[in-house]
Each structure stands twice: as C-alpha cells, then as structure tokens.
C-alpha cells in the first residue's frame, strides 16, 4: 500500500524508513518547505525561558547563535512541545529540556508551563510567522521568526501528477501539520476528492485534523501525536 508523506523533505526520511520496514511503499511528496532565517540577532539575557514548538524552531535558533550564546541556552529553562522537539534540542544543545507535556499540543504545553513558571518570567519562542498564538497570547513572550514555511514551486501541477500515480491503488495520505494539509487540499479537485474519500487520511494530531476536516475529509488520529503514533494507526489500515 502506498503512503504519501507530505512533511518537508529534510524531515521525511525517518518516517519513510519506518514505513518501508512495515512493508509499505512511501511516497515523499512535500507540501511544505522550511526556509531558515539567518539574519537575526537576539539578546538571550532578556529571557528566563525558551519554548520550542517544533524541531525547526530548535534548528533555526541554533543557526543564528554564536558558540557562547549556544552555551547560554543551556542555562535557560527549556520547554518543548513534544518528543521529536526534545530529541532535536538535546542533539543541538546537549541537554534534555525541562518541560514536555504528555499531549503534544500548544495548549498542553501552556498548561505545563503555567504550573512551574512565574508571571514575571519572560519567554522567547523561536518559531515561524504561521505559528498559532496560544503561547504568545498567554505568556509574557516574544516571538522570534527563525524560519518560515514556504509552498513548493509547481505544487498544484505536482498534485495532479500524484493523483495519476496513486489513483488506481489503495493509499494513505499523511499530514504532520495544519499547513502541510492546507497546502495539499487547496489544490485537490473534485475528482481527486472523491478518490481520497475511498482511501485513508492520517493526521498527526487534533489541530492538524481540524484543518483537514474544514476541507470535508475525516482523518484518523493516533493516540500519541508522533510519526511513530501515526505508524500504529497505519498498521491497522494494512489489514482492511
């Protein structure tokens, strides 16, 4: 069975490898590109906390810092949205984060932060302009746009080609963010939409699922909001 991976190319390989091991045929079809902003300065001394809502936020901040500033990050209180972001933070900055919620959403992260932070403490959130405002609106926080999400060139035409490639077989579409889903479904024509409804969609979590539902589709959601959680759902579809 074919499984379409719509996450950015540089983050698709791990998911593709997991799918291959399970006997699926992964198709890497990015509907999003990550573009890092390297022309930024930040005064880390102004902040008590740094909160990361994606691995790209970790990488983006690392890219703009000097060696001394990277060491300084280790002395900050660190909050991350989920397991992959935690692993990325440890890979780049050499230690575990202080906070990670059990449910990988901004709302859950905010609840955990509120339990241990003080009202006067200042937060830095390295993120993208398309980020949700949950943390910004509820914390004493500054956003630092260390990357942006761009739509790949010729995506509309490529989606037409994808339809021809997968239409005759059973397939699964996977989406790991609301933006990957939005960029995909806005170019889906009526014919492709009907084909998709006879197949399967797996969203990484409830926020991504809501975006998909706005386009009239009903995705499946894993219990754990990771690609490994998605794989658990995908395994069950193999038997159908």
From Swiss-Prot:
Protein family membership: Belongs to the uroporphyrinogen-III synthase family.
Q: Per the UniProt entry, what are the Gene Ontology biological process annotations, in alphabetical order?
A: protoporphyrinogen IX biosynthetic process; uroporphyrinogen III biosynthetic process
State the function annotated in the UniProt record: Catalyzes cyclization of the linear tetrapyrrole, hydroxymethylbilane, to the macrocyclic uroporphyrinogen III.
**What InterPro entries is this protein classified in?**
4pyrrol_syn_uPrphyn_synt_sf, 4pyrrol_synth_uPrphyn_synth, UROS/Hem4
Entry's Pfam families?
HEM4
Q: Which UniProt keywords apply?
A: Lyase, Porphyrin biosynthesis
Q: What EC number(s) does its UniProt record assign?
A: 4.2.1.75
* Pathway listed: Porphyrin-containing compound metabolism; protoporphyrin-IX biosynthesis; coproporphyrinogen-III from 5-aminolevulinate: step 3/4
> Does Manganese show up as a keyword for this record?
no
PANTHER family the UniProt entry points to: UROPORPHYRINOGEN-III SYNTHASE, CHLOROPLASTIC
Put simply, this protein is called Putative uroporphyrinogen-III synthase
Which species expresses this protein natively? Methanocaldococcus jannaschii (strain ATCC 43067 / DSM 2661 / JAL-1 / JCM 10045 / NBRC 100440)
Gene name per UniProt? hemD
Broad enzyme group: lyase
Molecular function GO labels:
uroporphyrinogen-III synthase activity
| Enzymatic reactions | hydroxymethylbilane = uroporphyrinogen III + H2O
């Amino acid at each position: 069975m074919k499984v379409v991976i719509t996450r950015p190319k540089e983050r698709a390989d791990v998911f593709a490898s997991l799918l291959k091991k399970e006997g699926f045929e992964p198709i890497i079809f990015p509907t999003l590109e990550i573009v890092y902003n390297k022309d930024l300065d930040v005064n880390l001394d102004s902040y008590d906390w740094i909160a990361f809502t994606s691995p790209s936020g970790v990488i983006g901040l690392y890219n703009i810092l000097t060696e001394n500033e990277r060491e300084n990050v280790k002395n900050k209180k660190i909050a991350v949205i989920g397991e992959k972001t935690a692993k990325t933070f440890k890979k780049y900055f050499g230690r575990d984060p202080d906070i990670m919620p059990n449910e990988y959403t901004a709302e859950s992260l905010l609840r955990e932060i509120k339990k241990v932070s003080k009202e006067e403490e200042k937060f830095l959130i390295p993120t993208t302009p398309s980020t949700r405002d949950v943390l910004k609106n509820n914390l004493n926080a500054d956003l630092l746009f260390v990357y942006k999400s761009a739509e790949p060139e010729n995506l509309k035409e490529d989606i037409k080609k994808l339809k021809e490639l997968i239409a005759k077989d059973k397939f699964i579409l996977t989406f790991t963010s609301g933006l990957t889903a939005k960029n995909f479904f806005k170019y889906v024509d009526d014919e492709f939409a009907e084909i998709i409804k006879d197949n399967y969609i797996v969203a990484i979590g409830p926020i991504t699922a809501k975006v998909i539902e706005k386009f009239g589709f009903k995705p499946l959601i894993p219990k754990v909001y990771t690609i490994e959680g998605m794989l658990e759902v995908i395994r069950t579809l193999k038997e159908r």
